[in-house]
From Swiss-Prot:
CDD domains from the UniProt entry: RecA-like_HslU (cd19498)
Gene assigned in the entry: hslU
Keyword Repeat: no
Recorded GO CC terms: HslUV protease complex
Described function: ATPase subunit of a proteasome-like degradation complex; this subunit has chaperone activity. The binding of ATP and its subsequent hydrolysis by HslU are essential for unfolding of protein substrates subsequently hydrolyzed by HslV. HslU recognizes the N-terminal part of its protein substrates and unfolds these before they are guided to HslV for hydrolysis.
Subunit structure: A double ring-shaped homohexamer of HslV is capped on each side by a ring-shaped HslU homohexamer. The assembly of the HslU/HslV complex is dependent on binding of ATP.
Any Gene Ontology biological process: proteolysis involved in protein catabolic process
Protein name: ATP-dependent protease ATPase subunit HslU
Superkingdom per UniProt: Bacteria
Subcellular localization(s) per the UniProt record: Cytoplasm
Organism of provenance: Halalkalibacterium halodurans (strain ATCC BAA-125 / DSM 18197 / FERM 7344 / JCM 9153 / C-125) (Bacillus halodurans)
UniProt keywords, alphabetically: ATP-binding, Chaperone, Cytoplasm, Nucleotide-binding
Length: 464
C-alpha cells in the first residue's frame, strides 16, 4: 500500500483541506488503517475480513464528498463518486448499478497506466528525441520500380532502383544527426516545425449509449471493431516542443505492458477501491407509493454489490468483496431506518456531520491549504494587485454566510463561493485597468456589498 499512515496522521492530513467533522475523519481513518492491518494477516484470515462500510449523514456542503475524495488521494486508491438517483432497477431504461464498479475499474486502469508511463518517461523522451532528429534530418527515400500489379498481388518483392548508400553518405547522415541532436539538447530547436505522423483520434460512435444502460455492450463492440480495422494515422505540423510531448506519449504507450497494467489495475480496484454513493437517502422510502417500490428495487440491486459479488467488466471479472463503500445523504425527509434492513446492515458505521457554524466558516476561508481567500488572492495577484482581508472582514463574510444558510436552504460551505463572487465582482472586473498595488477588504466594504443579501430574505433565495 502507498503511504502507510496511522489514523492520527490521516486525520492530520485531512485537516489540511477540511474543517471540523472530526467524527467522520476518525471513521474513515480507522477504515483505511484496517485495510493495512488486513494485508498483514495470513491469506486464510485475510479473505474473511471485509471492510466496514460507512454511512455519512449530514446536509449538503459540509464535507462528505471531500473527505472521501481526499482519503482516496492520500493512498492513491481508485475512487469513484456516483449518485444513487441515477440508477434504475434491472429491466428498466437507465444505468444499472454494476456500472459503478465498471467505472471504478476504468479509474484504476487510468491510475496504474499513468504510474507506469511515469516510470518509462525518461526512456520514452529519449526515443521521442531520436524520432524528432530523424524527422529534422531525414534519410534519402528509396524509390521502387514499377511492377506488374499481379506480381504485387501475389507478394513478389519489388526491386529497389536506388543504389546502396555508400559509407561516406551514411557517415555524413550520422554526423548531421549528431549535430542536430546536440542542438536539440541545448533547446535551440524548440520553435522549429516538424511534420509528425500521429494516430487519429476519431469520435466514438458508441458514446451515444452512455447513460442508457447499454454502455458495456457498446464498449465491447467498439473494442471488437477497433481490433478488426486498422488505426488511422494523419500528419500534423507541430513545433518541436509539441512534437516531443506527442511522441513521448506514443513511445511510452509502446513501452508499457497493457496486460500487466490491466492485471494490476483490477487487483487495485478489488483491494483498495473506494465507491462513494451520494444521495443514498433519495432511494429510501416506505414502499407506500409506486415510486417507493421502484426505489426499493434500486436498493435491492445495490445490495449484492455492497455485500460482495462478482461484476463482469471488459477487463475480466471483478470482485467487490473488499471494496470500501461510503454512503452519504442529507436524510432531511427520509431516515436511515427507511432503507431496507439488509442494506442498513451493510453500513454498520454511522457518522453524523454537523452543520457549519460562523467559526467553521472563518476557518474554511483562511485555514486549509486550498482556502478560498488564498485562491482569490492568487487570481488577482496575476493582475499585479495584492488583496488583503482583515480579520473583521473575514468574520463578517462568515456571519452573512451563516445567516443566509439559516434563512434559506442550507447549502453549507458552497454558500461562500457565490458570496465571494458577489463581493469581489467589481474588483475582478476593474482589476486590469486600475493601478493599485494593494487593496484591503474591510468589514465596511463587505457590509456595503453583501448586507442587502442578508437583510432581504426574498433576494437571498436567489443567491446560491
Amino acid at each position: 500500500m502507498k503511504n502507510v499512515l496511522t489514523p492520527r496522521q490521516i486525520v492530520e492530513r485531512l485537516d489540511q483541506y477540511i474543517v471540523g467533522q472530526e467524527g467522520a475523519k476518525r471513521s474513515v481513518a480507522i477504515a483505511l488503517r484496517n485495510r493495512y492491518r488486513r494485508f498483514q494477516l495470513e491469506d486464510k484470515l485475510r479473505d474473511e475480513i471485509t471492510p466496514k462500510n460507512i454511512l455519512m449523514i449530514g446536509p449538503t456542503g459540509v464535507g462528505k464528498t471531500e473527505i472521501a475524495r481526499r482519503l482516496a488521494k492520500l493512498v492513491g486508491a481508485p475512487f469513484v463518486k456516483v449518485e444513487a438517483t441515477k440508477f434504475t432497477e434491472v429491466g428498466y431504461v437507465g444505468r444499472d448499478v454494476e456500472s459503478m464498479i465498471r467505472d471504478l475499474v476504468e479509474t484504476s486502469v487510468r491510475l496504474v497506466k499513468e504510474e507506469k508511463m511515469k516510470g518509462v518517461k525518461k526512456q520514452a523522451e529519449e526515443q521521442a528525441n531520436q524520432r524528432i532528429v530523424e524527422l529534422l534530418v531525414p534519410a534519402k527515400k528509396k524509390t521502387q520500380a514499377y511492377k506488374n500489379p499481379l506480381e504485387m498481388l501475389f507478394g513478389q518483392q519489388q526491386e529497389n532502383t536506388d543504389h546502396q548508400e555508400t559509407s561516406a553518405e551514411q557517415d555524413t547522415l550520422t554526423e548531421r544527426r549528431r549535430r542536430m541532436s546536440h542542438q536539440l539538447a541545448l533547446g535551440e530547436l524548440e520553435d522549429h516545425y516538424v511534420t509528425v505522423e500521429v494516430e487519429e483520434q476519431t469520435p466514438q460512435f458508441f458514446d451515444m449509449l452512455q447513460g442508457s444502460g447499454m454502455e458495456q455492450m457498446g464498449m465491447n463492440m467498439q473494442e471488437m471493431l477497433g481490433n478488426m480495422m486498422p488505426k488511422k494515422r494523419k500528419k500534423r505540423k507541430l513545433t518541436v516542443r509539441e512534437a516531443r510531448r506527442v511522441l513521448t506519449e506514443e513511445e511510452a504507450q509502446k513501452l508499457i505492458d497493457m496486460d500487466e497494467v490491466t492485471q494490476e489495475a483490477v487487483s487495485k480496484a478489488e483491494q483498495l477501491g473506494i465507491v462513494f454513493i451520494d444521495e443514498i437517502d433519495k432511494i429510501a422510502g416506505k414502499g407506500q407509493q409506486s415510486a417507493d417500490v421502484s426505489r426499493e428495487g434500486v436498493q435491492r440491486d445495490i445490495l449484492p454489490i455492497v455485500e460482495g459479488s462478482t461484476v463482469v467488466t471488459k477487463y475480466g471479472p471483478v470482485s467487490t468483496d473488499h471494496m470500501l463503500f461510503i454512503g452519504a445523504g442529507a436524510f432531511h425527509v427520509a431516515k436511515p431506518s427507511d432503507l431496507i434492513p439488509e442494506l442498513q446492515g451493510r453500513f454498520p458505521i454511522r457518522v453524523e456531520l454537523s452543520n457549519l457554524t460562523v467559526d467553521d466558516f472563518v476557518r474554511i476561508l483562511v485555514e486549509p491549504d486550498n482556502a478560498l481567500l488564498k485562491q482569490y488572492a492568487a487570481l488577482l495577484e496575476t493582475e499585479g494587485i495584492k488583496i488583503v482581508f482583515t480579520d473583521e472582514a473575514v468574520h463578517k463574510i462568515a456571519t452573512i454566510a451563516t445567516e443566509v444558510n439559516q434563512e434559506t436552504e442550507n447549502i453549507g460551505a458552497r454558500r461562500l463561493h457565490t458570496l465571494l463572487e458577489r463581493l469581489l465582482e467589481d474588483l475582478s472586473f476593474e482589476a486590469p485597468d486600475v493601478n493599485l498595488e494593494e487593496i484591503v477588504i474591510t468589514p465596511e466594504y463587505v457590509t456595503e456589498k453583501l448586507a442587502a443579501i442578508a437583510k432581504n430574505r426574498d433576494l437571498s433565495q436567489y443567491i446560491l
